[in-house]
Amino acid sequence: MTKQHAFTREDLLRCSRGELFGPGNAQLPAPNMLMIDRIVHISDVGGKYGKGELVAELDINPDLWFFACHFEGDPVMPGCLGLDAMWQLVGFYLGWQGNPGRGRALGSGEVKFFGQVLPTAKKVTYNIHIKRTINRSLVLAIADGTVSVDGREIYSAEGLRVGLFTSTDSF
């Protein structure tokens, strides 16, 4: 069977309901925490390390929920939401590969913020480069990622780690 290499907003919503990879497997968060509108490219080859890559997008409009509260009179998308989107994509990648379990962000190395997403922006683009996947008692992916707004890179993260757990009882 051929793997799908792009996903629409409806596909991502199906993933948030646990319908894309099957019950008990990788899920994206539901809106409002779903920080992705579409995955325009996903592959298990290519990228900076030759081990897989994802490119995803979020459409920006001034009515997005976080602009009203972060910050009043100085609206900006919280940087942690961009970081979370990168973790969301690494977890999605593991599910897309057919690995079982529920995703959990496990940390990252260095994270840098050198720009911002304002309500006047049009589009955020996420680029994820898979460095390594480990499939033992825990399925784990390690990746680097960047966030760009309207074509300008504004965040970077190294060593993003996401694991899939068949049981989270002891987590």
Swiss-Prot record:
Where does the protein end up? Answer: Cytoplasm
Q: Which GO terms describe its molecular function?
A: (3R)-hydroxyacyl-[acyl-carrier-protein] dehydratase activity; trans-2-decenoyl-acyl-carrier-protein isomerase activity
This protein's major location comes to: cytoplasm
Positions annotated as active site in the UniProt record:
70
Gene3D superfamilies per the record?
Hotdog Thioesterase
Query: Which InterPro entries does the UniProt record give?
Result: FabA (IPR010083), FabA_FabZ (IPR013114), HotDog_dom_sf (IPR029069)
Pathway per its UniProt entry is: Lipid metabolism; fatty acid biosynthesis
Any one GO cellular component localisation term in the record: cytoplasm
* Biological process, per Gene Ontology: unsaturated fatty acid biosynthetic process
CDD domains the UniProt entry points to = FabA
Tell me which family the UniProt entry assigns to this protein. Belongs to the thioester dehydratase family. FabA subfamily.
Task: Provide the function of this protein.
Answer: Necessary for the introduction of cis unsaturation into fatty acids. Catalyzes the dehydration of (3R)-3-hydroxydecanoyl-ACP to E-(2)-decenoyl-ACP and then its isomerization to Z-(3)-decenoyl-ACP. Can catalyze the dehydratase reaction for beta-hydroxyacyl-ACPs with saturated chain lengths up to 16:0, being most active on intermediate chain length.
- What is this protein identified as? 3-hydroxydecanoyl-[acyl-carrier-protein] dehydratase
Tell me what organism the protein belongs to: Pseudomonas aeruginosa (strain ATCC 15692 / DSM 22644 / CIP 104116 / JCM 14847 / LMG 12228 / 1C / PRS 101 / PAO1)
